[in-house]
């Protein structure tokens, strides 16, 4: 039986390097990913909660104090002016204006990594108590499991019993792979879509575009940074968060063979790329970059980089699942993907406020008013 004394907190992924990759089945919950984020200050206050039994790590809950305000970009809007209220609370010295988050940045997934022999409610309860203690010691008013999958039975069934409130969050998409070759995959789709995909692959080639897998090197890292910024600015013109070339080199350094990079070239010039992360039997299409001036819509570079090449790779290497993130619902469903609903679980850590907060959030009238007048942060 695991005791509370065997639940520890580490502040760098270096301290859980071996166990995290062993327990994880997800590329965004690995040493290489978290080490890259820590190196760039993109995970400013990490907390790796571990549960041990007889000297072995049996569970890890990656969390962090949200100093980058991810909650107020991706979470549910539970009460009016929450961010302002937390800012006032911090100025008065009552509570910090940050939320403790359990999730891995950039992947829209929350996971607790368990040894398969200890995936039970007692370990989850101990980790939850440790979160309670951290929030009390550091004066953090709210914690959140930000993106819990509808398929995560342990978290879905038990977090509410641990005084977390549940709210729907974004819908992501995934593809389960059971085909022996790409033609079998195409044959699983509707006839019109099969024809369309074959045409898009042929058109890409006919336009002189070649797509090959490459390693991240100094020669190409600058181009990855440039093309990623072009795509980011297209969808968010106010964004100034350009990833430097050193980010890609650092990711290659720490993630190593977990990096899968497809590069599209025309006349030997890089015009696009897709960056994937792989761990064990899971592949995640993480990033896409493009030079829109060097191609037209008839090149179909995006679909080849973001869908067809990753699917072909996964089939060839017997990978079981690909994550494709959120948005573009019709595009993803037409290509065989399935939706995966995520939920945010939120807890107030003030013993006086928690009962009234839970009562308010469960009130049907308030829920209707909230859904009408308080758009969730991720919908803005």
Residue ranges and their predicted role:
Residues 1-380:
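N-acyltransferase acceptor-side catalytic subdomain
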């Amino acid at each position: 039986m695991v005791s509370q004394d065997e639940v520890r907190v580490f502040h760098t992924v270096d301290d859980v390097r071996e166990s995290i990759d062993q327990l994880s089945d997800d590329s965004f919950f690995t040493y290489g990913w978290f080490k890259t984020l820590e190196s760039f200050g993109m995970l400013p206050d990490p907390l790796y909660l571990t549960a041990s039994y007889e000297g072995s790590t049996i569970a890890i809950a990656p969390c962090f104090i949200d100093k980058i305000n991810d909650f107020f970009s991706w979470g549910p809007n539970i009460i009016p002016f929450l961010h302002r209220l937390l800012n006032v609370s911090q100025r008065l010295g009552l509570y910090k204006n940050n939320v403790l988050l359990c999730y891995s940045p950039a992947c829209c997934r929350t996971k607790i990594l368990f040894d398969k022999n200890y995936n039970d409610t007692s370990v989850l309860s101990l980790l939850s108590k440790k979160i309670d203690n951290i929030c009390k010691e550091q004066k953090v008013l709210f914690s959140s499991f930000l993106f819990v999958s509808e398929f995560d039975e342990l978290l879905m069934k038990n977090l509410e019993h641990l005084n977390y409130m549940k709210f729907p969050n974004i819908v992501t998409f995934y593809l389960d792979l059971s085909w022996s070759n790409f033609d079998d995959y195409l044959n699983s789709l509707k006839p019109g879509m099969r024809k369309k995909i074959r045409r898009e692959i042929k058109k890409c080639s006919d336009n002189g575009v070649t797509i090959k897998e490459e390693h991240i090197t100094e020669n190409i890292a600058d181009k990855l940074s440039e093309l990623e910024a072009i795509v980011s600015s297209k969808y968010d013109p106010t964004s100034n968060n350009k990833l430097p070339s050193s980010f890609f080199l650092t990711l290659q350094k720490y993630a190593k063979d977990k990096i899968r990079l497809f590069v599209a070239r025309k006349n030997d010039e890089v015009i696009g790329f897709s960056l994937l992360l792989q761990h064990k039997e899971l592949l995640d299409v993480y990033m896409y970059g493009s030079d829109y001036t060097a191609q037209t819509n008839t090149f179909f570079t995006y679909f080849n980089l973001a869908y067809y090449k990753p699917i072909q790779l996964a089939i060839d290497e017997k990978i079981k699942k690909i994550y494709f993130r959120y948005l573009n619902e019709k595009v993803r469903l037409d290509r065989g993907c399935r939706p995966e609903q995520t939920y945010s679980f939120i807890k107030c850590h003030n013993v006086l406020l928690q009962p009234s907060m839970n009562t308010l959030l469960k009130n049907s009238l308030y829920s209707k008013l909230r859904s009408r007048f308080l758009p969730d942060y991720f919908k803005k």
